[in-house]
């Protein structure tokens, strides 16, 4: 690789503020903030709003709608509009 053109790849401490979980991952993100990790070392720090630890798709806390529920809701909503022949 050509020297001087690639960003610095280093361990970075990501903090999911919603779940209060820390991830130590290699990244090229540029940040001026630092924080001491549980291993006692200081790492560049990035705060995240959502990660796999707090996103509903990954945690299984998402609202699931079933086909039966949608059909029942439709029938309930339009029950009074039945055509009389």
UniProtKB/Swiss-Prot annotation:
GO cellular component: ribonucleoprotein complex; ribosome
Highest taxon above the source species: Bacteria
Keyword Aminoacyl-tRNA synthetase: no
GO molecular function: structural constituent of ribosome
Transmembrane segments: none
GO biological process terms, semicolon-separated: translation
Family annotation (PROSITE patterns): RIBOSOMAL_L31
InterPro entries: Ribosomal_bL28/bL31-like_sf (IPR034704), Ribosomal_bL31 (IPR002150), Ribosomal_bL31_B (IPR027493), Ribosomal_bL31_sf (IPR042105)
Record key words, sorted: Ribonucleoprotein, Ribosomal protein
Keyword field contains DNA repair: no
HAMAP family xrefs: Ribosomal_bL31_2
Entry's family note: Belongs to the bacterial ribosomal protein bL31 family. Type B subfamily.
Subunit structure: Part of the 50S ribosomal subunit.
Protein name in the entry: Large ribosomal subunit protein bL31B
Lineage: Bacteria, Pseudomonadati, Pseudomonadota, Gammaproteobacteria, Pseudomonadales
